């Protein structure tokens, strides 16, 4: 059985006059024609505007004002209609989303009183659907937190700007339904590349500059200490004379001024340490000079060795050439020598020897020719 409208709506229809019932009848016919064409698949925002009605397609529906049956309940009698309509509506086809069969995909039954009495939804409330409840805190927190974490100096102005933006969003929700520009990238991140190096640069330079500044103080510490000690003991001459004067001049200087035992001990200590320092400097200087001289001598000897090696190679090559030439000369001479029988001498059995006067003799190998005057 089809659902019926509530009792309040039915009583409201009973109290209407005849003229008002005629106007409601026309309005209801227009609504039914629109729902039959569109299949009642409209969105959740109903729009019932009488200025643009759909064309009239056929005879009007039954005279009932609700999806109930034609016979009303016994407890709620209805007045007779002002005019009679055809009882049979068999010539009008029943669409799939017909009103009589209630094949309408809605959550509550449709009634004339309900449609007319139900107020339209507020457009601002519709725009608020999907927005998170509560104040827009996530948009303000990233800016203020990131500014503090990155040592950004303008964190207070960013916080005020985020508060002002939240107030505007609450006032003008219809103009700015969803805002993301401030949450995508905080403004402090754009300045992080410039603020971090400026803060780290002095820290990186301080350790390196400290030892460099302390070196001149360490070098002049001994001299300044001797000067302070001499000034405290009231020595009447500077420390440069104590260290640099020769022995005779230094003794004359001490004899010229009457000094106490403590002053003499201090002067001799300053001279001893100054002389040791000068001697150490001279020793280092002599060592450096000796090292430089040895390096130069080593370089000279290396060059001389290379020259001698080249000369030895040339001498070996010359000696080899002379041996080859001597062998060829032996072969040539023995080819021209003949004995009484006309036979040639063998180089393996005979050898050529030269006397002191330059005469050359042919002698058997293994014998030596005695020198003759």
From Swiss-Prot:
The modification Phosphoserine is found at residues 157, 170. A motif (PXY motif 2) lies at residues 79-83. It is found in: Nucleus, PML body; Cytoplasm. CDD domains: bZIP_NFE2-like. A motif (PXY motif 1) lies at residues 61-65. The keyword Nucleus applies. PROSITE patterns: BZIP, BZIP_BASIC. GO terms for cellular component: chromatin; cytoplasm; nucleoplasm; nucleus; PML body; protein-DNA complex; RNA polymerase II transcription regulator complex. Expressed in hematopoietic cells and also in colon and testis. Residues 268-287 are annotated as: Basic motif. Keywords: Activator, Cytoplasm, DNA-binding, Isopeptide bond, Nucleus, Phosphoprotein, Transcription, Transcription regulation, Ubl conjugation. It comes from the Eukaryota. Residues 1-206 are annotated as: Transactivation domain. Residues 266-329 form the bZIP domain. One of its GO terms (molecular function) is RNA polymerase II cis-regulatory region sequence-specific DNA binding. It holds the Pfam family bZIP_Maf. Changing residue 368 to R: 60% loss of DNA-binding and 5-fold loss of transactivation activity. Almost no colocalization with nuclear bodies. Belongs to the bZIP family. CNC subfamily. Homodimer; can bind DNA as a homodimer. Erythroid transcription activator nuclear factor erythroid-derived 2 (NF-E2), composed of a heterodimer of NFE2 and MAFK, possesses transactivation activity on beta-globin. Also forms high affinity heterodimer with MAFG; the interaction promotes erythropoiesis. Interacts (via the PXY motif 1) with ITCH (via the WW 1 domain); the interaction promotes 'Lys63'-linked ubiquitination of NFE2, translocates it to the cytoplasm and inhibits its transactivation activity. Component of the NF-E2 complex essential for regulating erythroid and megakaryocytic maturation and differentiation. Binds to the hypersensitive site 2 (HS2) of the beta-globin control region (LCR). This subunit (NFE2) recognizes the TCAT/C sequence of the AP-1-like core palindrome present in a number of erythroid and megakaryocytic gene promoters. Requires MAFK or other small MAF proteins for binding to the NF-E2 motif. May play a role in all aspects of hemoglobin production from globin and heme synthesis to procurement of iron. This is Transcription factor NF-E2 45 kDa subunit. The gene is NFE2.
